[in-house]
C-alpha cells in the first residue's frame, strides 16, 4: 500500500493497506 498507510507504507509497503 499506498492507499491507506502513508506513514506505514514508507517502512512496510506490503502492510500499508493492512495497518491502515
Swiss-Prot record:
Its main location: mitochondrion. The keyword Repressor does not apply. Keywords: Acyltransferase, Lipoyl, Membrane, Mitochondrion, Transferase, Tricarboxylic acid cycle. The keyword Mitochondrion applies. This is Dihydrolipoamide-residue succinyltransferase component of 2-oxoglutarate dehydrogenase complex. Binds 1 lipoyl cofactor covalently. Signal peptide: none annotated.
Amino acid at each position: 500500500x499506498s492507499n491507506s498507510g502513508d506513514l506505514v507504507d514508507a517502512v512496510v509497503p506490503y502492510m500499508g493497506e493492512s495497518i491502515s
